[in-house]
């Protein structure tokens, strides 16, 4: 069995205070020796400059960075420029996504789907970049069917993606079923589960409603029952997500990718509960 790989996702801070806080978060999480830190791109590429700045800071600290690139709002020339910039910086990993269309933006851009972006990256840069793509164990909310969604995922891998990071989920069976179905189509690329620590229920419910991630009914009802009792929400969430991670790793998941929301403590608590090495 190969060693499990771990990674953490950040979003580019909007304020000077946020930059300082994220630097402190990185310092804490860097002690865990992750494979990389990924940096989001914002809806329609809205954080492009701040994404680049955050990636530069991560590189300057001696860590591996994986910037996100998205189809939405991007032109071929724009993507080409960013690829060359990242290549010159020594970046070797990219997360290629379709991305979210901001309200008011009428056109998605020159790339319609993530597989087109993956193909373009390969055509422009050969095998320089390890390309990560998104996977949806509970299926993309815009997919016509589960089978169609898996075929779409296969197109991204066939276009040149090396591995995938999933949308977060709280039902391990959905992940194992998705991996099994991908395997039946001949997809062998590693599919790393995305992990969302539970910190605030209202925030989690808002994210989940927006992205189509399912909160199991019993989990939702339990969290709702805690009301404003933040300590109970977080204690329950820690137990739930730790058990999820244990089952995923025990079932052969190749690693875990934590959606940190720029906070170290929730991911560290799960890490420590899992008994993973520092």
Regions found by a protein language model. Name each.
Residues 2-5, 33-36, 61-65, 90-92, ...:
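Short, well-ordered coil/turn segments that N-cap beta-strands
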Residues 5-21, 43, 65-77, 130-148, ...:
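Active-site mouth loops of central-metabolism enzymes
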Residues 9, 37, 86, 156, ...:
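Conserved, mostly hydrophobic/aromatic
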Residues 16-29, 51, 76-84, 145-155, ...:
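Short, acidic/polar
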Residues 17, 109-136, 185-238, 243, ...:
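Active-site pocket-lining/capping segments in soluble small-molecule metabolic enzymes
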Residues 17-19, 45-57, 75-82, 100-121, ...:
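Active-site-adjacent beta->alpha loops and helix N-cap segments on the catalytic face
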Residues 36-47, 69-71, 95-97, 162-171, ...:
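Catalytic beta/alpha-barrel core
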Residues 119-165, 239-251:
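Active-site/ligand-binding-proximal alpha/beta "capping" segment
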């Amino acid at each position: 069995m190969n060693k499990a790989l771990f990674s953490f996702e950040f979003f580019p801070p909007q304020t000077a205070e946020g930059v300082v806080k994220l630097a402190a978060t990185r310092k804490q999480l860097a002690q865990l020796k992750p494979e990389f830190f990924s940096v989001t791109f914002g809806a329609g590429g809205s954080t492009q400059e701040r994404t680049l700045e955050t990636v530069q800071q991560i590189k300057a600290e001696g860590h591996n960075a994986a910037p996100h690139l998205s189809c939405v709002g991007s032109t071929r020339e724009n993507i080409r420029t960013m690829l060359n910039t990242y290549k010159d910086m020594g970046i070797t990993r990219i997360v290629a996504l379709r991305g979210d269309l901001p309200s008011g933006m009428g056109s998605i851009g020159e790339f319609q789907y993530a597989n087109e972006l993956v193909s373009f990256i390969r055509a422009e840069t050969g095998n320089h970049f390890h390309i990560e793509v998104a996977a949806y164990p509970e299926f993309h909310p815009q997919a016509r069917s589960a089978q169609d969604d898996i075929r779409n995922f296969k197109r991204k891998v066939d276009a040149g993606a090396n591995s995938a990071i999933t949308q977060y989920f709280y039902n391990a069976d959905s992940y194992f079923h998705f991996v099994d179905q991908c395997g039946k189509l001949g997809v062998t690329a590693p599919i790393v589960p995305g992990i969302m620590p539970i910190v605030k229920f209202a925030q989690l419910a808002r994210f989940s409603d927006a992205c189509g991630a399912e909160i199991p009914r019993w989990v939702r009802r339990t969290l709702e029952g805690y009301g404003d009792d933040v300590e109970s929400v977080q204690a329950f969430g820690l137990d739930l997500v730790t058990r999820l991670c244990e089952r995923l790793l025990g079932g052969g998941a190749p690693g875990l990718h934590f959606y940190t929301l720029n906070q170290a403590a929730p991911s560290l608590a799960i890490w420590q509960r899992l008994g993973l090495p520092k």
